């Protein structure tokens, strides 16, 4: 699964797990080594929005005010991103790193450390999610729609004609099956077929609440685990096209969700991390 799903927004410090050759089961957790990294170690900010481990083994940290790289010993801050909020990180090859920020999409050449601002609609378009498919296709989720990189250019996809509508505020992307991608947005869960262009929007409603704002998502065994902005975590069964409430996380603002082996790790806004 793509590295940019490692989304933990931690306040005042970030804990980096220096992985040993063991699985992340409960019996193995005592064998993990933990190290705390803060601004005193060179981190650009103690608020971490995204963590991405690249194919060369470097850990990239997207913070509230910059981009950092951790090599296991030292932290290197990239001054080119100073003052920018980093939301998402991905790589398409061994050279280029794609960085989604509050001021647009940037491409970092890791050989030269040169950066390039990639124009989508406008240079200042906020990029919340950057995702690379299994075939190497780049998808970029922004506050004004989805952009797909193909044939050396970006193609814009809108869900509804109004780019400013909540459904086009994309917060997360995962890859499903048979050309299908699942996107979370402030206006619902989107099922999108990248080949046909067809899409369908799902929202949750019961006798007590209506939920359309989804903050993040993860896919595990034909089920989507969806973070919300105040209603905890919902589960969407793809085969049944039906929602259910996750009783372990019924309330709260979910900041991040990832899969670790067959477990779901949920990053909350102020209540730490829950493992399901």
Residue ranges and their predicted role:
Residues 1-276:
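Carboxylate-rich, polar loop motifs that coordinate divalent cations or form catalytic acidic clusters
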């Amino acid at each position: 699964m793509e590295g940019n799903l490692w989304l933990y927004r931690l306040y005042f410090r970030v804990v980096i797990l220096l992985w040993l050759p063991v699985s992340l089961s409960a019996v193995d957790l005592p064998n993990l080594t933990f190290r705390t990294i803060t601004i005193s170690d060179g981190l650009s900010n103690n608020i971490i929005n995204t963590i991405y481990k690249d194919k060369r083994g470097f850990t990239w940290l997207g913070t509230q005010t910059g981009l950092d790289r951790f090599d296991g010993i030292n932290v290197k801050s990239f001054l080119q991103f100073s003052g920018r909020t980093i939301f998402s990180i991905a790589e398409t090859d061994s050279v280029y790193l794609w960085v989604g920020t509050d001021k647009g999409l940037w491409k970092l050449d890791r050989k030269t450390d040169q950066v390039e601002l990639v124009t989508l609609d406008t240079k200042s378009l906020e990029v919340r999610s950057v995702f690379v498919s299994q075939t190497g296709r780049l998808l970029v989720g922004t506050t004004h729609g989805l952009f797909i990189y193909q044939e050396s250019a970006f193609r814009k996809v809108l869900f509804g004609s109004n780019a400013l509508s909540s459904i086009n505020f994309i917060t997360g992307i995962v890859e499903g099956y048979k050309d299908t991608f699942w996107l979370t947005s402030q206006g619902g869960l989107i099922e999108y077929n990248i080949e046909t262009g067809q899409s369908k929007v799902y929202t949750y409603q019961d006798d007590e609440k209506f939920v359309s704002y989804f903050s993040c998502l993860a896919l595990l065994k034909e089920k989507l685990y969806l973070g919300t902005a105040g209603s905890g975590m919902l589960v969407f069964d793809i085969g049944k096209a039906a929602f259910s409430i996750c009783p372990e996380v019924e309330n709260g603002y979910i900041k991040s969700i990832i899969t670790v082996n067959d477990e779901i790790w949920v990053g909350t806004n102020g209540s730490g991390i829950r493992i399901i």
